[in-house]
Design a protein with these regions (language model features):
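Core catalytic region of metal-dependent phosphoesterases/phosphodiesterases
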Residues: 3, 7, 12-85
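Acidic, His/Gly-enriched loop-helix segments that form or flank divalent-metal centers
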Residues: 27, 87-199, 204-225
Length: 225
């Protein structure tokens, strides 16, 4: 059975991602690596994070990069929508990592084409024998194929508090916890790396957690979008 390594929200903490990958050492040919979205914003090195993801894409046969709400907000920003929201929730840090001016809303020239192509073509969910993987959560009682982007990218309490059986465990990020949340129907692995917590990987089927502790905090509060 192929192992799956699932990694929570990175938020521009590229050095933590690099260190975590060294610790878990997944097999690029045999293992599946799933990263649950929110690669960018808030942290110091969104550009370096995307560059590392592109390198992983070249290395791994089974790499799944999921869309998070922050990738969606970047795409909206580039499309001229919700610009203030993007900048307020860490977009300024992303732009700074690319050496870009927040005033250059209408232009994508600051974003390398390979980076834009990766960020614009991310699925919102993935399923394998070990579980269902999403950024934020699922709407109880709705089949996976009928889930809305609002739930997949933005869900919080209504999903987290639900006892609904989704058929498989749901592996998710988005909502930070001090330690991974483990229940019968879901596992939350956002452990607040950008807030001074940890970047966490879940190894399946072993149900083992591996984390790298942050050395500082790059954002002032939790549960902001």
């Amino acid at each position: 059975m192929r192992r799956t390594f699932a990694i929570g929200d990175i938020h521009g903490c590229s050095s933590l991602l690099a260190e975590l990958l060294k610790r878990i050492s997944p097999d690029p040919q045999g293992d599946t690596l799933v990263i649950l979205g929110d690669f960018i914003n808030r942290g110091p090195d969104s550009r370096g994070t995307v560059e590392l993801l592109l390198e992983l894409k070249r290395q791994f046969r089974h790499l799944i990069l999921l869309r998070g709400n922050h990738e969606q907000m970047l795409l909206d920003y580039l499309d001229g929508r919700h610009q203030g929201l993007f900048l307020a929730v860490g977009g300024r840090e992303t732009l700074a990592s690319y050496g870009a001016d927040p005033a250059a809303v209408a232009s994508t020239s600051w974003l390398p084409p390979e980076h834009l192509a990766l960020l614009a073509d991310l699925p919102t969910c993935y399923e394998n024998e070990h579980g269902i993987y999403v950024h934020a959560g699922l709407q109880p009682g709705v089949h996976l194929t009928g889930q809305s982007p609002e739930w997949l990218l933005w869900a919080r309490d209504d999903f987290i508090r639900s006892n609904h059986d989704f058929g498989k465990r749901v592996i998710f990020g988005h909502t930070p916890f001090a330690d991974p949340l483990v229940t019968a129907n879901r596992i939350g692995i956002d452990t607040g790396a950008v807030y001074g917590g940890r970047l966490t990987c879940l190894l399946l089927p072993e149900l083992k957690f591996v984390s790298v502790a942050a050395t500082g905090s790059y954002s002032w509060g939790r549960h902001q979008r």
